Amino acid sequence: MAFANFRRILRLSTFEKRKSREYEHVRRDLDPNEVWEIVGELGDGAFGKVYKAKNKETGALAAAKVIETKSEEELEDYIVEIEILATCDHPYIVKLLGAYYHDGKLWIMIEFCPGGAVDAIMLELDRGLTEPQIQVVCRQMLEALNFLHSKRIIHRDLKAGNVLMTLEGDIRLADFGVSAKNLKTLQKRDSFIGTPYWMAPEVVMCETMKDTPYDYKADIWSLGITLIEMAQIEPPHHELNPMRVLLKIAKSDPPTLLTPSKWSVEFRDFLKIALDKNPETRPSAAQLLEHPFVSSITSNKALRELVAEAKAEVMEEIEDGRDEGEEEDAVDAASTLENHTQNSSEVSPPSLNADKPLEESPSTPLAPSQSQDSVNEPCSQPSGDRSLQTTSPPVVAPGNENGLAVPVPLRKSRPVSMDARIQVAQEKQVAEQGGDLSPAANRSQKASQSRPNSSALETLGGEKLANGSLEPPAQAAPGPSKRDSDCSSLCTSESMDYGTNLSTDLSLNKEMGSLSIKDPKLYKKTLKRTRKFVVDGVEVSITTSKIISEDEKKDEEMRFLRRQELRELRLLQKEEHRNQTQLSNKHELQLEQMHKRFEQEINAKKKFFDTELENLERQQKQQVEKMEQDHAVRRREEARRIRLEQDRDYTRFQEQLKLMKKEVKNEVEKLPRQQRKESMKQKMEEHTQKKQLLDRDFVAKQKEDLELAMKRLTTDNRREICDKERECLMKKQELLRDREAALWEMEEHQLQERHQLVKQQLKDQYFLQRHELLRKHEKEREQMQRYNQRMIEQLKVRQQQEKARLPKIQRSEGKTRMAMYKKSLHINGGGSAAEQREKIKQFSQQEEKRQKSERLQQQQKHENQMRDMLAQCESNMSELQQLQNEKCHLLVEHETQKLKALDESHNQNLKEWRDKLRPRKKALEEDLNQKKREQEMFFKLSEEAECPNPSTPSKAAKFFPYSSADAS
């Protein structure tokens, strides 16, 4: 069900799936086999094999990284690496020679580096790098990182395995498979990706918390870890599984060198400031280039010597140690050595120096110039591996009755470059150990001592004598971390007493209460390697000797298994990163589509209301125009009607005037004849004047009545139009209110919808994190089970070997004790032969009982060991389960906090939006009221303008004055 939900989260619709796209630096139209010829295999990476290829035309060599890609999405995962390689032209970064995608395989052709990776060189030479070599590598890595960071590129996987060497002594930074190319200078990343042992603390935190992203400073931390790795062959905490390493990095102090006294103050200070857990105070690559540790480096001679040594011709010589027949010689030599143990001073058990390893007296490291020029001297290098030939750990011969075993030195061999002083030191060491050498010792003068970790001895109880110390396994440092120890016992033998040397050679069996003989197979063979090479015209010869032991094979096996585990983890990280990228792309697409939809909805709503407003305004205009037309018609008709009435009134008025004239004539005719003429003339003049006055008054009165009637009609028309415009304004404002209310409602709905989408996306993101975390936990449990099974199998094998070895040891000890007992009886000379035979018989019976008791003790010890081992395995699983539960719980808590913070942020945004909504409503109402007041003011001004002069139009293009043309 969870997997189905996971697939649903990452599922995209059909139209969202990406089509095949062309990439600038990837060719699809060419088969790489037509251009390149595979001439060999270089290695097997986490995502594909790496081949050595040769250009068919130019003959140039390249490293071909061939990756099978099943889809375009997988192909896109590697495009970042190709783009980074194509855009980074730097002398210390590998160059891209071409990229091809053909037949479902991606071919990435990069520059071929014959020197190989630094970690492979260290394994080949079986030692870490010297400080001058580390300085040159560090300087060149810093220059490469400074260039990358200036291009806004984070490497994210710095380690010795990704630092390649050329024959010219320069490095090439490689493997940009998990690198990030930012778009902005201050951009940060939150992907949990990289190799755990080299991860910065801020990157580790991104496994469960994405709130603390990291930037290019993470590469500086990885650089510091890489320098420690080059000094000690292995990175810090390499003995832990990746799960514990992440916890260790996050909670512990920054790692340091195991033996700081061997290294310079500048190196230690450089590591201190580079391994700063606070990325804000951690320096950048440009700042570290000014550090005294690397600022004065101008020559790469140290790296040229390193590459020449790694690529030099090797002459190997395997020398056999004691064979089984030599055991009898060792038994015969017991009588000779017995005198030594009796005559010399009493030797206490080797617990006096049990807590002090051989590195207790390390040689002082020399300056870089001195160490480079002293190849042939035994202790000239801090690592002590370039030219050391020392005495091998002595083989333990059978001991005396007190249970003390006597050391028998192995053969000693002299290196090609040894001078006479080393021989004197060896002779002096033998002289200090005292006594005569046994014949077995005289026959083994060619073997040389191996590295301290290779000479670790095991007791029957599984305890180790590492570097000459009797320490329990929990306190003993891991083997690979001791590979850079001093020049073994050659430089320190003169200051060590006999008791210390003896403690190196003996194996203490605490439960049996006696010292047991070591397994002869442990020192069966010695491998001597002689390397001859030329640097700057000077021929250098370096001889190293190493005892081949089972521990060597175990170390190699553990290294291989750890690489396998890291490869599995890298695959999980890559898949997780791909899923995270797909989910992020899906979320971005969802947000983009949602924003587009929101914008479309808002635009559609605005368009709807704009259309309504346009329709309303158009209707208003049409209605007003129609009303104006009606009003004009009404004015003309009213003016015509009034004119007709006034004409009739004027006609009647004229008739009345005529009647008045007749009456005046009648009155004059009634006068006497002599007065008529004069009176007629006078009356007629008066009548004419009165007629004119009355006519003028009548016409003026008619005109005034007409204008008043027209004014009333115009006022009525204007009032009617004003009412209509008020009505339309109210409708328009109501429509505007509806428009804004709809937009506000949509905004609130969109806020809610966006919050729900972001919340669901956050849940999907954490669901994916939980899914990937559970997959990682399942892989970690699987690795832990394999580790526990290996430990149990190794314990069973060791117990089987001890069980098979015990009878041989008992027989050898029995012979020795019987011989010594017979010799003591012979010396004492007491009793008859029968009594001596009886004593020998009793002694033999006691020996049988003692041996039987030892076998029972061994069986009981093996049972206890197995029980403890099973308990330890169960404890490992329980601890792992607890750590995984804590991570899951932390992830759930963080998800809860993020969801809560998201809800609070949404509520706050909603509150702020509502708070801003009130002023918006108020501003809208004020704007609408202002428009209403402006309209009323316009109408009022129109009325006032019409009052003093009725003939003046109140509103242009809407109200027209009365004119004589209206009446016609």
From Swiss-Prot:
Record comment: activity regulation: Inhibited by the pyrrole-indolinone inhibitor SU11274 (K00593): intercalates between the ATP-binding Lys-65 and alpha-C glutamate (Glu-81), resulting in a partial disordering of the lysine side chain. Also specifically inhibited by erlotinib. Slightly inhibited by gefitinib.
InterPro entries reported in the protein's UniProt record: Kinase-like_dom_sf (IPR011009), PKK (IPR022165), Prot_kinase_dom (IPR000719), Protein_kinase_ATP_BS (IPR017441), Ser/Thr_kinase_AS (IPR008271), STE20_Ser/Thr_Kinases (IPR051585), STK10_STKc (IPR042743)
Modified residues (Phosphothreonine): 952
Active site, renumbered: 157 (proton acceptor)
EC number, as in UniProt: 2.7.11.1
Annotated spans, Disordered: 337-411, 425-490, 668-690, 827-865, 910-929, 944-968
Protein kinase domain mapped to chain residues: 36-294
Tissues expressed in: Highly expressed in rapidly proliferating tissues (spleen, placenta, and peripheral blood leukocytes). Also expressed in brain, heart, skeletal muscle, colon, thymus, kidney, liver, small intestine and lung.
Subcellular location: Cell membrane
Mode of membrane association: Peripheral membrane protein
Pfam families: Pkinase, PKK
Post-translational modification: Autophosphorylates following homodimerization, leading to activation of the protein.
GO molecular function: ATP binding; identical protein binding; protein homodimerization activity; protein serine kinase activity; protein serine/threonine kinase activity
Biased composition (Basic and acidic residues): 835-865
The keyword Phosphoprotein is assigned to this record: yes
Note: Inhibition by erlotinib, an orally administered EGFR tyrosine kinase inhibitor used for treatment, enhances STK10-dependent lymphocytic responses, possibly leading to the aggravation of skin inflammation observed upon treatment by erlotinib.
Disease field: Testicular germ cell tumor: A common malignancy in males representing 95% of all testicular neoplasms. TGCTs have various pathologic subtypes including: unclassified intratubular germ cell neoplasia, seminoma (including cases with syncytiotrophoblastic cells), spermatocytic seminoma, embryonal carcinoma, yolk sac tumor, choriocarcinoma, and teratoma.
Annotated protein name in UniProt: Serine/threonine-protein kinase 10
Species: Homo sapiens
Taxonomic lineage from the root: Eukaryota, Metazoa, Chordata, Craniata, Vertebrata
Gene: STK10
